[in-house]
Amino acid sequence: MFIFPKDENRRETLTTKLRFSADHLTFTTVTEKLRATAWRFAFSSRAKSVVAMAANEEFTGNLKRQLAKLFDVSLKLTVPDEPSVEPLVAASALGKFGDYQCNNAMGLWSIIKGKGTQFKGPPAVGQALVKSLPTSEMVESCSVAGPGFINVVLSAKWMAKSIENMLIDGVDTWAPTLSVKRAVVDFSSPNIAKEMHVGHLRSTIIGDTLARMLEYSHVEVLRRNHVGDWGTQFGMLIEYLFEKFPDTDSVTETAIGDLQVFYKASKHKFDLDEAFKEKAQQAVVRLQGGDPVYRKAWAKICDISRTEFAKVYQRLRVELEEKGESFYNPHIAKVIEELNSKGLVEESEGARVIFLEGFDIPLMVVKSDGGFNYASTDLTALWYRLNEEKAEWIIYVTDVGQQQHFNMFFKAARKAGWLPDNDKTYPRVNHVGFGLVLGEDGKRFRTRATDVVRLVDLLDEAKTRSKLALIERGKDKEWTPEELDQTAEAVGYGAVKYADLKNNRLTNYTFSFDQMLNDKGNTAVYLLYAHARICSIIRKSGKDIDELKKTGKLALDHADERALGLHLLRFAETVEEACTNLLPSVLCEYLYNLSEHFTRFYSNCQVNGSPEETSRLLLCEATAIVMRKCFHLLGITPVYKI
């Protein structure tokens, strides 16, 4: 937001200047005069509002948005007949030309050049935009380069003050505010009676990070675990349970043992034993008919699975609310009837389907035997989330292999009028697809027995390797066993998460413990160690950092101090970009670059014992705070010593 002087007379002068600019424009047609009159009325109110806000607000957390609001006023003053033109502000790729750029001049020139404009080209438009830019303490200077690019240099004094305010008020004051109020993030979603494997890792940690970023951005997030807890497979599981444990009340997790082995054994018998297969099919009918004996057995199997899932979620520090397939089952019939009443459902080869333009096959919503399927359940879940949970944004995190399924049922929902045709308008839906996890041989990540890798085994291995690395550094002699164990867990689990999240989610990535546990390069280990080093610098100073926050002053006089400060101030716009594009890798890139900026600063700017010690300790603390917030958003536990 703009930073205007608090002096009332100077604020009134600016308001008058803005109003004068609007009133002293000449127009030649009645239409232009009417448009100008309406614009003058709206802009006069807007100008007063802008000045009032500017007098009371400082840094709101998003540099790009604040600059955009400044240039929005400038655009309205410079080209009042083009009220729909939005400011185009971006961070400068090359810092030597400025910190940010406004790139409106060329596009604006192409709009106005045939309308008898006074301007002679894009550079002139750029100069006019700079001249009309409201005074702001955040802007040190503006200059026009080339074909009208406006380079903006921020005030180092203002930047320092903004960081000081964050140190006092907390980093949550930098959180962006998105236009959406409530979102559903559907992620993880394992199948009952099957162990979570490495494939669930990506959905779980990508979904958790998206949820965390949205929550930080003032969005109410409904974290949904759409577990596979319904379907024909439960017939064979229940029947096998009855055979092994006639007294189902005595069934415990210990008695069943490995649920994955139990599932495979029941599937093996189902495939080979016709009598068992027939019983299993009858069991499905009884389960779906509500038979209490079969419902009880089904609930027992689900409970055992949930216990195993909960252990994984606890280790990953992931929170979810389960609303599986069975939750939506009672609503399916009425949803299908609603679709049918709208003329969307047709008969095809005994099944009931929805034909969709652009797809070779229809979307089946009722099978030929009258049963429901994934599409009917997913459509019902979407209907429920829109109508009962009042979600504005529904995000599904699954592998890219399911893209067509989501495209089809999203299109069916639009055809039904549940969603707008414009996929950028709320309520909206997004499929957040992700690629495969590969082994170092470039093939799908599996064990030697060709089975999928169990997630618990993977986490155990990460923690074990991390602990061994710490012992090799002699930490077992410096720390208590509890400290060693907690740090090994934080580093090991953090390494697994970051190795996934730093990649563009759409790409496949190679799983390598050696790479992810490397303490050099773009790894969680390097970043966690960097944070611990910053904490060590502050501790070694012997200063009370909380007291310095209250009394100390921060300056960004050295080039590396300024570069670090600028990067810190770009945190909010980075989080907003990561949320908007549903890309956690954007935040990972920011975090890694933050550590690189700090390394350059620390290499070139002495902290402890220097004349600038107080200021630089505050900059260290600000860096540590933002790093910790990044770790939190990525679901990684920070370490404070190493």
Swiss-Prot record:
The record's section on InterPro entries has: aa-tRNA-synth_I_CS, Arg-tRNA-ligase, Arg-tRNA-synth_N, Arg-tRNA-synth_N_sf, ArgRS_core, DALR_anticod-bd, Rossmann-like_a/b/a_fold, tRNAsynth_Ia_anticodon-bd
UniProt keyword annotation of Membrane present: no
Identify the SMART domains for this entry: Arg_tRNA_synt_N, DALR_1
The main location is plastid
Q: What is its EC number?
A: 6.1.1.19
Q: Which EC class does it fall in?
A: ligase
Where on this chain is 'HIGH' region (motif)? 190-201
Q: Which UniProt keywords apply?
A: Acetylation, Aminoacyl-tRNA synthetase, ATP-binding, Chloroplast, Ligase, Mitochondrion, Nucleotide-binding, Plastid, Protein biosynthesis, Transit peptide
Sites where N-acetylalanine occurs are at 54
PROSITE patterns reported in the protein's UniProt record: AA_TRNA_LIGASE_I (PS00178)
Cross-referenced Pfam families? Arg_tRNA_synt_N (PF03485), DALR_1 (PF05746), tRNA-synt_1d (PF00750)
Localisation per UniProt entry: Plastid, Chloroplast; Mitochondrion
Q: Which reaction does it catalyse?
A: tRNA(Arg) + L-arginine + ATP = L-arginyl-tRNA(Arg) + AMP + diphosphate
Gene Ontology terms describing biological process: arginyl-tRNA aminoacylation; embryo development ending in seed dormancy
Signal peptide location in the record? none
Q: Which residues does the Swiss-Prot or TrEMBL entry list as transit peptide?
A: 1-53
MF terms in GO: arginine-tRNA ligase activity; ATP binding
Q: What happens when the gene is disrupted?
A: Embryo defective. Developmental arrest of the embryo at the globular stage.
One GO cellular component assignment for this chain's record is: cytosol
Which protein family is it in? Belongs to the class-I aminoacyl-tRNA synthetase family.
PANTHER family, alphabetized: ARGININE--TRNA LIGASE, CYTOPLASMIC, ARGINYL-TRNA SYNTHETASE
- What is the role of the protein in this entry? Forms part of a macromolecular complex that catalyzes the attachment of specific amino acids to cognate tRNAs during protein synthesis.
User: This chain belongs to which protein, by name?
Assistant: Arginine--tRNA ligase, chloroplastic/mitochondrial
This protein's encoding gene: EMB1027
